[in-house]
Amino acid sequence: MIGIIGGTGIYEMAEYGRLERRGSLITPYGKTPEISVFKLHGRRVAFIPRHSPGHDKPPHMVNYRANIWALKELGVRQIIATNAVGSLKRSIGPGDFVVPHDFLDFTRSRPSTFYDEKTVHVDMTEPYCRNIRSALSGSSGVVDGGVYVCTEGPRFETPAEIRMFQTLGGTVVGMTGLPEAVLARELEMCYASICLVSNYAASISPSKLTIDEVFEIMDEKKNDLIDIIDAAIRDLKTEQSCPCQHALRGADVNNHEEELYEGFNDICKPEKEEQHHDGP
């Protein structure tokens, strides 16, 4: 099953397939927003609105652990996340799409691991799944590669912070991409992001940053974003051939790998999916 974590502007994604069910899940970390499970191109897809349907959860208050855990419980093995971002480069402007290959984490107060009671050091040498990245960047006009900088929010960044991020090699800056990527890796799920640039970052932009421009760009480009995700779902194979699915090998100091996410073995069995493309 494929999971889609929808950010600003694409809450209609669930209407593009054949709806099977819809509802919230109770996890050890709390209740999730309403998740829609539907069929698209022969694949089962679970869509979860990151901020809740009314966009009433600010980035630093999103229950990232509950969202990722719930997707794992549903049997999701591959996650496509969408993120609205500001650009740190003049060559990448509002309306452009970026598929990052790495990240810088400047979040501070968010629960960022499932392993508070076990000593687990998951490898992040390749932070985003190569297979999903390839599927997303196959669409025309998508920038393949970049460094995603995640800040705590909910405020926008200062000019000094933006200069620091640029010096460190950042490409885009947002508030929602982490700890999602890490949590997915800790549960051995494939994860990649498609970022839509909504504005230039502070001091690069000639004007004051507002949330209005974020929503304006998302509204203008949401159909293109949905098309990119749709094409990626068509291209993604059910069989995994990437390191993501073995991320916990060698990660547990006490070598109790089989106990790290006890309870998923019966729930998350390999999915048998149709291989034909039957369209929305």
Curated annotation (Swiss-Prot):
Phosphate binds at T8, R50, H51, T176. GO terms for molecular function: S-methyl-5-thioadenosine phosphorylase activity. Its EC number is 2.4.2.44. One of its GO terms (biological process) is L-methionine salvage from methylthioadenosine. The keyword Cell membrane does not apply. The record marks E157, I211 as: Important for substrate specificity. Coiled coil: none annotated. Pathway: Purine metabolism; purine nucleoside salvage. InterPro entries: MTAP, Nucleoside_phosphorylase_d, Nucleoside_phosphorylase_sf. Keywords: Glycosyltransferase, Purine salvage, Transferase. Disulfide bonds: none annotated. It catalyses: S-methyl-5'-thioinosine + phosphate = 5-(methylsulfanyl)-alpha-D-ribose 1-phosphate + hypoxanthine. CDD domains: MTAP_SsMTAPII_like_MTIP. GO terms for cellular component: cytosol. The keyword Transferase applies. Substrate binds at M175, N199, Y200, A201. Pfam families: PNP_UDP_1. Homotrimer. Although this enzyme belongs to the family of MTA phosphorylases based on sequence homology, it has been shown that conserved amino acid substitutions in the substrate binding pocket convert the substrate specificity of this enzyme from 6-aminopurines to 6-oxopurines. Belongs to the PNP/MTAP phosphorylase family. MTAP subfamily. Catalyzes the reversible phosphorylation of S-methyl-5'-thioinosine (MTI) to hypoxanthine and 5-methylthioribose-1-phosphate. Involved in the breakdown of S-methyl-5'-thioadenosine (MTA), a major by-product of polyamine biosynthesis. Catabolism of (MTA) occurs via deamination to MTI and phosphorolysis to hypoxanthine. This is Probable S-methyl-5'-thioinosine phosphorylase. The lineage of its organism: Archaea, Methanobacteriati, Methanobacteriota, Methanomada group, Methanobacteria.
